[in-house]
Regions:
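Short amphipathic alpha-helical interaction segments
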Residues: 365-380
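Short acidic/glycine-rich loops and adjacent helix/strand connectors
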Residues: 323-327, 391-394
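Short, small-residue-biased leader/transition segments that mark boundaries at the very start
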Residues: 3-8
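Short amphipathic alpha-helical interface segments
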Residues: 329-364
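Accessory beta->alpha helical hairpin/"wing" motif in late/C-terminal subdomains of nucleic-acid enzymes
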Residues: 388-408
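Extended, regular secondary-structure scaffolds
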Residues: 141-144, 148-151, 156, 327-334, ...
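Beta-strand-dominated lipid-handling architectures at cellular/organellar boundaries
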Residues: 31-280, 284-312, 409-512, 569-626
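A short, conserved structural fragment
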Residues: 379-390
């Protein structure tokens, strides 16, 4: 291309002649790709402080020739069309091959379901005549429905590959609000590149997609850049929060697909650095590893589950106070550095919870690349938040919990369960009831040390606030099996409210025809451990124990085994009772006061039902005393 300052030197006699000849032709620049014209009268001056200072042979500032044009309509012709820059004042520096302008305007038409623009105002701008680029670092995008958006504007003639003029505009920040409908608003940056629209800003702050739900609930999706394509909003790195009162269901990074027409939110936990990272719930106080979350705003049901190999991979649920030596040991690398211990010791020594990864590597006298994988593992497991670009780390409360639990200086729990659903319908979350309904739960571990496991009937479990559970199922603890139990688990008191028990089965002896003792149709409380000793770090000998709250019957035999005379009227009636140390390997010695009924063979006999030498139930009573 041939610009006005490309070939001219001050020392040449024809310097001004050539410049004036070019201006008389009304062309600032001509090239095969673009042309720039102006048709106003020109004032010629010497700028003693040009934008790029010109020096004489003696090193002193010699100023620069400047051509000043006012109220100019600058015509820009390129291969895909043409546009005009209306400007109050334009300063042309032929020696520098640059044009500076103020108060410029360009027609900027962009239409979408999110924003419709018609003009960009350039408070100041520059045109590089060597490449034809227009740049404005102080501009305002004017739309039909919203207030002006502050940002930066650019045009590059060599980036034009469409049949229309491709401008680029990026807002300074993400504080621009757009109302999509009465339930949905977007607080976002604006980035327009040709015919594409996204929400990244120069500041790189997060944009927010906010869904207003009933009863003061809301869903907030945050991303540094949402792609706004037709009726879809997409992002590969979206922070998700479902907020109700002071509680939330949260995930730090998911893939988002939202369709405005169907009004369905689809979130996927399958790709990226944080794939398979848990959802965190402050209401339920659990972590949930799920492949997806689907929700249609306005409805009461959210769905979560497994998409890939759903008949083999489970949804995993753990208490936020869960601790495992296995997980702790897996955080030790081949050099013997346990990254969690190193991180916690570092922040305690420096008395602050944030740092850069290079600070930690320096303290450990190692290369930051060697500990980066461990830092990402901590990030993925919810021990820290981490910015991979800057290396900034912020330590979260889970790190302290694990560190102190490992040292046996803090209580913890072993509360966990899995859900496997071949149909991928693992969790139905009713946001009105504030309950999660699980399918495909084989067992629930409440305490490994106390040998406390619950087996839901048909795999169905209802999760309520603060890890509380409701279900019908069986309980296994030591030599005791509670069969067909309608139960509630209360996490804070760490007990099972056994509302109705079909059968309490107690192993007696393998040498008997029936090696179990049975209690039928009972209820009561099963206390797993002291609420301050969920980890069973302290040895409390009576736990776990069961306290009945209603009478029951012990049938000494069964008519199908011993004949019709031994029917259901041949039994021992027990009032309320208590059984301690359910998890021990041997049965305790029972003494249950009650009444023996013998189908009218004897009058009712008051006695104590005890554990006999063969571990079966019986009583010893001298009848002649009656």
């Amino acid at each position: 291309s041939r610009g006005l300052g490309d070939v001219y030197k001050r020392q040449e006699d024809n310097y001004f002649k050539e410049i004036l000849n070019q201006i008389n032709q009304k062309a600032f620049i001509e090239s095969p790709s673009y042309k720039l014209y102006g048709d106003k009268k020109i004032k010629i001056d010497i700028d003693q402080a040009p934008p790029f200072e010109s020096l004489s042979n003696y090193g002193a500032s010699s100023g620069s020739v400047v051509f000043i044009l006012s109220n100019l309509s600058l015509k820009y012709v390129h291969n895909s069309g043409e546009f005009f820059v209306e400007t109050d004042e334009l300063r042309f520096y032929p020696d520098l091959n640059i044009i500076l302008g103020e108060h410029g305007k360009i027609d900027f038409s962009f239409e979408s379901v999110y924003i419709n623009t018609n003009q960009v105002i350039l408070d100041n701008f520059s045109i590089d005549l060597k490449n034809g680029k227009i740049i404005s670092n102080s501009s305002k995008l004017i739309s039909k429905d919203y207030k002006p958006i502050l940002g930066v504007f650019s045009y590059d003639p060599f980036e034009q590959d469409q049949s229309f003029t491709q401008f680029v505009f990026q807002s300074n920040s993400s504080n621009n609000e757009f109302v999509i409908n009465k339930f949905l608003k977007l607080k976002a940056g604006v980035y327009i590149d040709g015919n594409t629209l996204s929400t990244s800003s120069k500041k790189r702050d997060q944009s927010e997609l906010i869904f207003i739900l009933e009863n003061d609930k809301e869903i907030v999706l945050r991303s540094k850049s949402f792609s706004l394509i037709n009726n879809q909003i997409l992002s590969n790195n979206t922070q998700f929060s479902f907020i109700e009162e002071n509680d939330s269901l949260y995930h730090p990074s998911l893939e988002l697909k939202y369709n405005i027409n169907t009004n369905q939110i689809q979130l996927f936990n399958l790709e990226g650095s944080l794939k398979n990272t848990p959802f965190y719930s402050t209401f339920f106080e659990v972590e949930i590893i799920s492949d997806y979350l689907y929700y249609t705003p306005g409805q009461r049901i959210m769905n979560l589950g497994i998409m890939i190999a759903p008949d083999q991979r489970p949804v995993e649920v753990k208490s936020t106070k869960y601790y495992s030596d296995r997980i702790m040991n897996e955080l030790t690398d081949l050099n013997g550095i346990n990254i969690l211990k190193a991180t916690y010791n570092f922040v305690m020594k420096n008395r602050r919870l944030d740092f850069f990864i290079d600070d930690l590597s320096y303290a450990l006298k190692t290369n930051s690349d060697l500990i980066r994988g461990g830092i990402i593992d901590l990030w993925r497991d919810g021990f820290i938040s981490f910015d991979p670009l800057s290396g900034f780390v912020k330590v979260l409360p889970k790190t302290r919990h694990y560190f102190l639990s490992h040292l046996k200086r803090s209580d913890y729990d072993e509360y966990s369960f899995n859900s496997i659903s071949p149909s991928s319908k693992n969790i139905i979350y009713d946001i009105e009831l504030r309950s999660m309904f699980f399918n495909g739960v084989e067992k629930i571990t409440l305490s490994n040390k106390n040998k406390m496991e619950v087996f839901p009937r048909l795999g169905k479990v209802e999760l309520r606030r603060d890890r509380n559970l409701k279900l019908i199922g069986d309980i296994s603890v030591g030599n005791f099996d509670f069969i067909g139990v309608d139960l509630l688990f209360d996490y804070n008191s760490y007990k099972l409210d056994l509302i109705e028990i079909d059968t309490l089965k107690m192993i007696a002896s393998k040498d008997l025809i029936d090696n179990y003792n049975y209690l039928y149709n009972i209820g009561g409380d099963l206390l797993i451990n002291n609420p301050r000793n969920k980890s069973s770090l302290k040895l409390l000998p009576n736990y776990p124990y069961f306290v009945s709250d209603k009478s029951t019957k012990v049938f000494f035999s069964m008519p199908e085994d011993y004949g019709p005379e031994y029917d259901s009227s041949f039994y021992f009636s027990i009032d309320q009772f208590r059984i301690d140390s359910l998890d021990k390997s041997t049965l305790p010695k029972f003494e249950f006061p009650g009444t023996f009924y013998s189908n009218n063979i004897f009058n009712p006999l008051e006695a104590k039902l005890i554990t006999m030498p063969d571990n079966s139930f019986g009583f010893d009573l001298a009848l002649e005393e009656k």
